[in-house]
């Protein structure tokens, strides 16, 4: 493989959301993913940096912290479901950019700041949907969230009567698939340095995608769960070695082994200039960017918002 270097048992889960009114879903559309944020923990541009990526006027180089929206048709004609993976610090800005006013649930990969510090803003969805929101995560992650956001999960301890998010925690287990609104979700074990975290595989009918951010390793038992994918989203932080993230070359090696139909690199730092790297990638590998929509049918499009 050519190296890329810098040029310098199924669980059925009841949805707790109170508002069951759903937007119309375009006929013929399929399982798809919207990149709300494609950057690393510092975001791009970084504070106080004048490198060529942080100064780039290409909107694809302007990356907010990592989060995606998964959406797919519902069982009833003309309806859809959509789930948020992670709540980035810019979540409010991200969802407003893309006119997202309803979610069927939230899934958390791990409790690092760039993946959870938008959790408080879920309270606005409670108001719009007039009901609670399902929150799916591993038990250890739920405990960490309850520690960090005690005012949300134990509102009775707040000195003032505050308006906080109304969340319904659901512990999930690695490898135990669950049905969320007409799709099969399988939590995947990934390694983020020494920290075990989650990725997710989503199957609906014959379509499938997997989201594997913040990974530096894939355990042997996870590989079979990543076979026969239409779309793979995988971490590719930078060109140089990093102890807790795949490099570009390491991500390409994983893609070559897993052989998805298409793959997209995400969680990218300011080492990567979009136009430069994408021109040198294999034909079925692409760079993500904020606002990109990836459809399992093979279509991609720019989502209205950041790129307008």
Task: Describe each PLM feature range.
Residues 1, 102-109, 202, 227-237, ...:
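A signal for specific C-terminal beta-sheet/loop modules enriched in small/flexible residues
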């Amino acid at each position: 493989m050519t190296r890329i270097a810098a040029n310098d048992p199924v669980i059925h889960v009841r949805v707790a959301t109170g508002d069951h009114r759903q937007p119309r879903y375009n006929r013929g559309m399929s399982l798809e993913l919207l990149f709300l944020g494609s950057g690393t923990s510092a975001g791009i541009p970084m504070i106080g940096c004048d490198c060529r990526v942080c100064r780039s006027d290409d909107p694809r180089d302007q990356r907010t912290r990592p989060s995606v929206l998964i959406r797919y048709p519902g069982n009833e004609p003309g309806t859809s479901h959509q789930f948020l993976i992670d709540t980035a610090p810019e979540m409010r800005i991200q969802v407003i950019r893309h006119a997202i006013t309803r979610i069927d649930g939230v899934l958390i990969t791990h409790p690092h700041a760039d993946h959870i510090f938008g959790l408080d803003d879920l309270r606005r969805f409670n108001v719009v949907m007039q009901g609670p929101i399902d929150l799916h995560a591993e038990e250890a992650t739920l405990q960490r969230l309850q520690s960090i956001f005690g005012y949300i999960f134990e509102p009775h301890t707040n000195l003032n009567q505050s308006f906080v998010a109304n969340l319904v925690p659901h512990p999930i287990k690695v490898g135990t698939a669950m049905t969320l609104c007409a799709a099969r979700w399988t939590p995947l074990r990934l390694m983020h340095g020494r920290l075990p975290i989650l990725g997710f595989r989503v199957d609906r009918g014959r379509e499938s995608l997997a989201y594997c951010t913040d990974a530096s390793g894939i355990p042997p038992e996870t590989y079979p769960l990543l076979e026969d994918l239409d779309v793979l989203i995988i971490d590719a932080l930078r060109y140089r070695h990093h102890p807790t993230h795949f490099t570009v070359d390491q991500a390409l090696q994983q893609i070559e082994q897993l052989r998805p139909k298409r793959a997209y690199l995400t969680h990218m730092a300011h080492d990567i200039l979009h136009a430069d790297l994408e021109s040198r990638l294999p034909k079925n590998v692409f760079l993500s960017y904020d606002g990109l929509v990836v459809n399992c049918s093979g279509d991609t499009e720019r989502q209205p918002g950041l790129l307008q």
